[in-house]
Regions:
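Mid/C-terminal beta-alpha module of Rossmann-like enzyme folds, strongest
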Residues: 3-9, 205-273, 281-352
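N-terminal Rossmann NAD(P)H-binding glycine-rich loop of SDR-like oxidoreductase domains
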Residues: 8-37
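SDR active-site strand-loop-helix element
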Residues: 18, 42, 84, 117-123, ...
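Oxidoreductase cofactor-interface core, primarily capturing Rossmann-like NAD(P)-dependent enzymes
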Residues: 28, 35, 127-240, 258-266
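Conserved glycine-rich Rossmann-like NAD(P)H-binding loop of the short-chain dehydrogenase/reductase
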Residues: 37-44
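NAD(P)H-binding glycine-rich loop region in Rossmannoid oxidoreductase-like domains
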Residues: 47-112, 122-130
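Glycine-rich portal/gate segments that line the openings of hydrophobic small-molecule binding cavities
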Residues: 347-348, 355-364, 368-437, 448-450, ...
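Beta-strand/loop substructures that line and gate deep hydrophobic ligand-binding cavities in soluble
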Residues: 432-480, 490
């Protein structure tokens, strides 16, 4: 029996999404809206929701899930309640907090007459008394919700593949930063990962489950892989050389989490329980969910395609775009503005700005005239040497110049840059076409604040593998000379052009 139900926009049952500022919650909301459901988001910090493109289409309830009175107010009138909260990474006794929060939520849902609870937990071996505290806590929360008296669907997933997922980000950083890795035995553990868009499709479909369904469902993608195989496959899709992984038996979960903390930016309190859980085989034992939420005709998304989707924004150079265009629809595998700073892959930046004693129009003329015969307003020798080195390794070098000495358009070559985005009078974004172990952009912009003109300059670099990381840190000491000099000289050029007596 299929649980898929279509509703007219905004005409469906009211769904409550807890954890809407989290990884899954923030991506589930637009899926529910697209399916015609009305949505209320419950958040401890509602201000963190404001950058989402869907904020104007939802209700917002301010509540801490351990506050019974606030939860009762937030859940009133709700038909389907999504419980997407866990205390992992708080550094406290997260299992006790999870039990208390789930009990409060379950009682409030029953008192409010909620028709369905949907929870996303962790996949683990059944009946294993040696479960990690993380997986054991997820299981306890599921049991509390199943015993609530409200029909519950407890979905159990292993690693969710998508930009922003903590498990995926840990694998991404390990794969990108370590060409050779001495690894613990858990790299040989079997895992059944699932693409985030497939997980969201199951979660959305559970809103229409029959009332008599009160059970767990294992959800996973079409492949079972070891962690080592996942790292090798990630490297292949990302265009990295094959990784060398040497398993050793001596690294305990505690030591492994310390090592992960050194290599990746994933916080230690979050990395440790994730690492501890990797010693367990996490493979689906059934696929009963397909009886209610059928698999798509083309099948579930495979691991390689899930990685490609997660890396799509990087490949399309969308790293440089800002969150000012949050109204644009985004894919579930894309990063979101509420994702942690460490999510989405490495992005190094050099940001400088200064007030300019000139009109915005005068400053823009200087910016649009940069490069070619006008130069780069910075240490000329450094640019010349970088251009010569680029030519020596088969790059384009500095000799391309520019099409027009004063005007630019999107697609123009500009020495070893390409004009990627141009908003006349406001923004010039250049993408580097020099040979680099990564991708680089240079963004020059004009801002007017309270009648004053400001120049903002931002250099961005997305490293490719360990060599890319080493390259950034090797050239970083020179940024003060190159980019600092550019910022000062662009400002001075605009102020000279604005001086009295200049044409």
């Amino acid at each position: 029996m299929s649980a898929t139900t279509a509703h007219a926009p905004g005409d469906g049952p009211l769904c409550l999404v807890t954890g809407a500022t989290g990884y899954i919650g923030g991506r589930l909301v637009p899926e529910l809206l697209a399916a015609g459901y009305r949505v209320r988001c419950m958040a401890r910090s509602p201000g963190r929701l404001h950058d989402h493109p869907w904020i104007g289409q939802v209700e917002v309830a301010h509540a801490d899930v351990t506050d019974a009175a606030a939860v009762r107010r937030g859940i009133e009138g709700v038909e389907v309640a999504y419980y997407l909260i866990h205390a992992l990474g708080t550094g406290e006794d997260f299992a006790a907090i999870d039990r208390r929060a789930a009990s409060v939520f379950a009682a409030a849902a029953k008192d409010a007459g909620v028709r369905r609870i949907v929870y996303l937990g962790g996949l683990g071996p059944a009946g294993d008394g040696r479960l990690s505290e993380h997986l054991r806590s997820r299981g306890e929360v599921g049991e509390i919700l199943l015993a609530s008296g409200v029909p519950a669907a407890v979905l159990r997933a292993a690693v969710v593949i998508g930009s922003g997922s903590a498990s995926f980000e840990m694998m991404r950083y390990l794969s990108e930063r370590l060409p050779v890795m001495i690894a613990p035995r858990w790299v040989r553990t079997r895992i059944q990962p699932i693409a985030v868009r497939d997980a969201l499709r199951y979660l959305t479909g559970c809103a229409a489950l029959p009332r008599d369904v009160n059970r767990t469902f294992d959800i996973g993608g079409p492949e079972v892989l070891t962690y080592e195989e996942m790292m090798h496959r990630y490297a292949a899709v990302a265009g990295l050389p094959r990784r060398v992984v040497i398993p050793v038996p001596v690294l305990t979960p505690g030591l492994s989490s310390l090592w992960v903390g050194l290599v990746t930016p994933v916080p230690g309190p979050l990395a440790r329980p994730l690492v501890e859980s990797l010693r367990h085989e996490v493979v689906c034992h059934e696929h009963d969910i397909a009886r209610y939420v059928p698999d798509p005709p083309e099948g579930l998304i495979g691991f390689d395609e899930a990685i490609r989707l997660a890396l799509k924004r990087i490949r399309n150079a969308d790293f440089a775009t800002r969150w000012s265009s949050v109204s644009a629809p985004r894919e579930p595998s894309d990063p979101l503005p509420t994702d942690p700073d460490w999510a989405g892959g490495s992005l190094h930046t050099d940001v400088r700005e200064s007030e300019v004693a000139a009109s915005p129009e005068t400053l823009w003329r200087v910016i649009e005239g940069i490069g070619g015969e006008h130069g780069w307003y910075s240490w000329p020798l450094a640019w010349a040497v970088r251009g010569r080195l680029d030519r020596l390794v088969g790059g384009v070098g500095l000799r391309r110049g520019r099409r027009d000495p004063y005007r630019l358009r999107v697609g123009d070559s500009l020495d070893f840059w390409r004009v990627e985005e141009l908003l006349p009078g406001t923004l010039l974004r250049l993408r580097a076409e020099m040979r680099l172990p990564g991708r680089a952009w240079l963004e020059l912009s004009v801002e007017e604040r309270q009648g004053r003109t400001w120049y903002r300059q931002r250099a961005l670099f997305h490293p490719r593998g360990l060599l890319g990381q080493l390259y950034w840190w090797a050239v970083r000491p020179f940024h003060g000379i190159v980019f600092g000099g550019m910022q000062r000289n662009v400002r001075r050029a605009a102020e000279r052009a604005a001086a009295p007596g200049r044409p």
